[in-house]
């Protein structure tokens, strides 16, 4: 099952192009009397595209143009961008723990091998196997990355997922 998050932009960072004209900022478009709506509301200062179907509407006088768009955002995208916007509070906490661990353990200029070793060492020295290896009594959280990243204990799967998250967030190709 895929888990999705939102993609966030500042309204003024977007450029709009109509026909053969040069790209315009939102402010320039507004000065021309053109309105842009997202899902039936005026475009906010900060746009967060949540997964699913969305509708852009451009209104210029009596002319109305509508465009439906589909947005999806994968876990890997969130790791690469180091942005867990749109995930549940619990999910965001796990991403943030992975991002923090990367910030604390990965330095600019490290080789791929050095990054792998740093991630390995962090996970091995900062967490333990849950219940001293007695997996039958392990809580559900012990099977996800939050086990070793937040609770500081987990099963093998927890270590593997946490390693993957940290590796991708540190720029390794996984």
Question: Language-model segments: which ranges?
Answer:
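Short glycine-rich, low-complexity/disordered patches
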Residues: 2, 42-45, 114-118
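Low-complexity, Pro/Ser/Thr- and charge-rich linker/hinge segments at domain boundaries
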Residues: 2, 73-89
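Secondary-structure boundary elements
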Residues: 89-148
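Solvent-exposed, low-complexity, repeat-rich "mucin-like" stalks and linkers
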Residues: 1-35
């Amino acid at each position: 099952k895929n888990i999705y998050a939102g993609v966030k932009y500042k309204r003024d960072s977007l450029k709009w192009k109509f026909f053969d004209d040069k790209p315009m900022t939102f402010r320039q478009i507004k000065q021309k009397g053109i309105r842009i709506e997202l899902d039936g509301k005026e475009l906010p200062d900060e746009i967060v595209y949540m997964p699913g179907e969305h509708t852009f509407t451009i209104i210029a006088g009596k002319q109305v143009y509508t465009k439906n768009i589909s947005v999806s955002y994968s876990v890997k995208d969130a790791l690469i961008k180091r942005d867990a916007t749109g995930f549940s509070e619990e999910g965001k906490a796990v991403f943030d723990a992975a991002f923090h661990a990367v910030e604390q353990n990965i330095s600019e200029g490290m080789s791929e091998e050095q990054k792998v070793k740093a991630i390995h060492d962090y996970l091995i020295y900062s967490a333990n196997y849950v219940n001293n290896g007695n997996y039958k009594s392990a809580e559900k959280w012990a099977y996800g990355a939050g086990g070793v990243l937040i609770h500081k204990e987990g099963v093998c799967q927890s270590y593997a997922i946490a390693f993957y998250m940290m590796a991708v967030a540190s720029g390794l190709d996984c």
